[in-house]
Amino acid sequence: MSYIPFPDISPELFSIELFGVTFALRWYALAYIAGLLIGWRLVLRMIRAERLWSFGPPMTEDQLERLLTWVILGVILGGRLGFVLFYQPAHYLAHPLDILKVWEGGMSFHGGFLGVMTALVAFCLKERISILPVADLLAAATPPGLFLGRIANFINAELWGRPTTLPWGVAFPGEAAQSCPGIEGICARHPSQIYEAGLEGILLFTVLSLLVWRRGWLHWPGSVSGMFLAGYGATRFLVEFVRQPDAQFVSAGNPLGLAWQISGYGLTMGQILSLPMILLGLYLILRSRRTA
């Protein structure tokens, strides 16, 4: 069976030791930082482009700088709490202090999304500005961060896919990745992180950019946010078919790791969380057109 060996890339970009304590910059942290900076520059560019707006941009550049702090808190707190609540509630209920160990991994996009939405609503109410136009700005600027995050997932050899015999399957390192029932020798898996980087990163960013800069969708508040939600939800739903579910959902009687099933058919937790995003996205698109 042909497969691609996992590249020998350290998850740490570099590390330094100060006063006997080692501090490391990991690719995952760099992806978060770069994603936020790129997103900030993209939003700033859209704010300055007057032709994109019917009645001017929804907020000032000073307000954008203040919003960035709120978004950072929403991403980190929401992403971590989402992982705790959606994927491993029993473990963290028994070991609550482990919630603080963010350096060990464990972030949920759906939780981060809810965290950012909460921060966005609170910020807009505080600043007395419209929520949907600001949400459109953030939605259009989010995919580059998703792309970088998925690449970091690949470098960390985490969130890999299900076993495959396809020639582009990757032999990820580690006992968990190589534990494939019914497969002897090397176990190759779908590089689902790369699939997601291409779909929710490159493809979604291309679509949203065309809608913003060529089709003028920022003139219809809520439409860009709706397309982002529907697009991300749909791509994540599809990738879940080849993505390895979290270990706590997998058992001898449930090898596919379905969080909900009936008569042998069901959905993974990622698919369950993506369905409301798709429905809300379609609703926002239709609503924006009716109120245009």
Curated annotation (Swiss-Prot):
Coiled coil: none
Membrane topology (UniProt): Multi-pass membrane protein
GO biological process, one term: lipoprotein biosynthetic process
Pathway annotation: Protein modification; lipoprotein biosynthesis (diacylglyceryl transfer)
Sorted UniProt keywords: Cell inner membrane, Cell membrane, Membrane, Transferase, Transmembrane, Transmembrane helix
Bilayer-crossing regions: 18-38, 67-87, 105-125, 193-213, 222-242, 266-286
Any single Gene Ontology cellular-component annotation: plasma membrane
EC number: 2.5.1.145
Main location: membrane
Positions contributing to a 1,2-diacyl-sn-glycero-3-phospho-(1'-sn-glycerol) binding: 150
Pfam family, one: LGT
Gene Ontology MF: a single term: phosphatidylglycerol-prolipoprotein diacylglyceryl transferase activity
Compartments (UniProt record): Cell inner membrane
Family affiliation: Belongs to the Lgt family.
Function per UniProt: Catalyzes the transfer of the diacylglyceryl group from phosphatidylglycerol to the sulfhydryl group of the N-terminal cysteine of a prolipoprotein, the first step in the formation of mature lipoproteins.
UniProt-recorded name of the protein: Phosphatidylglycerol--prolipoprotein diacylglyceryl transferase
